[in-house]
Design a protein with these regions (language model features):
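A conserved short beta-strand
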Residues: 152-163
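Short beta-strand/loop motif that positions the catalytic acidic residue
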Residues: 172, 177-180, 184
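Gly/Ser-rich "nucleophile elbow"/oxyanion-hole loop immediately N-terminal to the catalytic nucleophile
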Residues: 51-57, 106-136
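A domain-start/cap signature at the N-terminus of enzymes
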Residues: 23-61, 140, 145, 157, ...
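Active-site machinery of serine-nucleophile hydrolases
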Residues: 59-61, 65-113
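Short beta-strand immediately N-terminal to the catalytic nucleophile in serine-hydrolase-like folds
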Residues: 132-134, 159, 179
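Histidine-bearing beta->alpha loop at or near hydrolase active sites
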Residues: 97, 181, 210-220
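Active-site-adjacent alpha-helix of alpha/beta-hydrolase-fold enzymes
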Residues: 83, 182-208
Length: 272
């Protein structure tokens, strides 16, 4: 074999290895499509990381609540953007991921709690490390759920949403990060500011972080799902120690360059 052929073989092998590594990174776990598991409840995806399948040790749980554009009865829609889509693109999240689909209307805190209990009953979930992350309609769902069951959630992040609860005092009992763009025309930033002002006015904002992204529109918040810092911040919390992590910052530059750090992701769905 001449030198030229050897070089060609090396190139082909390198490409094959890169392909295997890429596929492995994107499929390092198993997706379960769960329907009718909870009577009258949501259908959902349940992601199981590869290392859990080997060791069966306790793992954190991330609950992802989508926005209005993914509502319906086709579960594949839930993977168009968000946490599961980030995993598909290569994001490594050391946690189970529970991603329900809302058929329409507001998210129900009690139905979400039913899914949380299902996860704890069927998998070795670390109940001290349950996290909730949602955008738009899912941002409302996040605050409504964690405000109703604050003792069950270690930390939450609500993006460009609001809160429907009459009594929002539960939101002051867990680490919470609220983000909203000031140029949001779909859900005005006033919806998030109303929550922040309530917590401040009632002196229960010690576990609160909030950021108003100057000039940010509604869809730009979708980029947070593809940012490693989002998951680092969430998973740094535990219910055993109610203290908010303030050493991890997410800046405008982080958000603007998200798609440069990973592949194009799901820019087409920045309109929820």
């Amino acid at each position: 074999m001449n030198v030229l052929n050897i070089k060609r073989v090396i190139v082909v092998l390198t490409m094959m290895i890169a392909s295997i590594v890429s596929v492995s990174a994107q499929t390092a776990g198993e997706y379960l499509k769960i329907t009718d598991a909870v009577p009258g409840g949501y259908n959902f995806w349940y992601f199981i990381p590869e290392d859990y399948k080997v060791e069966q040790h306790k793992m954190p749980l991330v609950i992802f609540l989508h926005g209005a554009s993914l509502c319906g009865k086709d579960l594949m829609r839930v993977r168009r953007y968000g946490v599961l889509n980030a995993i598909d693109k290569g994001m490594v999240i050391p946690a189970f991921v529970l991603a329900p689909q809302n058929p329409g209307g507001a998210w129900s805190p009690s139905k979400l709690n039913d899914l949380l209990e299902w996860a704890k009953a069927n998998y070795n979930v670390d109940s001290t490390r349950v996290y909730v992350l949602g955008m738009s309609l899912g941002g409302y769902g996040t605050l409504d759920f964690v405000g109703s069951y604050p003792e069950k959630v270690a930390a939450a992040m609500a993006l460009c949403g609001g809160c429907s609860l009459k009594d929002m005092s539960g939101l002051g009992k867990l680490p919470l990060w609220i983000m909203h763009g000031t140029a949001d025309r779909a859900v005005g930033v006033k919806e998030s500011k109303r929550v922040v002002n309530y917590l401040k006015d009632n002196g229960i904002d010690k576990l609160l972080r909030f950021d108003w992204l100057e000039g940010g529109n509604h869809g730009v918040l979708a980029r947070l799902f593809y940012l490693q810092k989002t998951y680092d911040w969430l998973i740094s919390h535990t219910t055993n120690k109610r203290k908010i992590e303030d050493c991890i910052d997410i800046t405008w530059d982080d958000i603007k360059t998200t798609y440069q750090d990973m592949k194009k992701m799901s820019e087409d769905y920045e309109h929820d």
